[in-house]
């Protein structure tokens, strides 16, 4: 197995968590654990993506344009995270991520750089609509990389009794992620605001060994 794929864990940080001063510290605490040797960070759009939604309502541009702007919002937030987490660094492809891991740094994937080159090569289509937000992008990257685990960092805890469709209806995940769940490997959910950073195992594919 190559250095690009060996035990890679996609770690998706909810964009709303950028508004919390403790996020850099809590994130570093989580990523320092031995079980996350090759984390690949993806940062959600948060308030920046919300601005895109507002602009679309005002200016009536199409879904594809909104998607592109929302991905650019993720890049803005990724740059912010790289600025406030000293061990993190922005990367645009697998080679740059591998270099970051070799340097004991935490790569943050610039999806605006990665997706246009990667999407034509992958069988799973990523919708360019609001049905596919940063949750879906993180899931898509997990499959495309491929990674052995997806870790969702959220502002709330998870009850394992709640089905994915209900979580999507409540706005806790997007509908694409809910629909792709059975295709994904291990998926963990972490409430980054909780007193104890304890991952909840949300999903394990039947034929996927738990790393």
Question: What positions do the PLM features span?
Answer:
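Nucleotide/pyrophosphate-binding catalytic subdomain
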Residues: 1-206
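An anion/pyrophosphate-binding glycine-rich loop and adjacent beta-alpha core
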Residues: 210
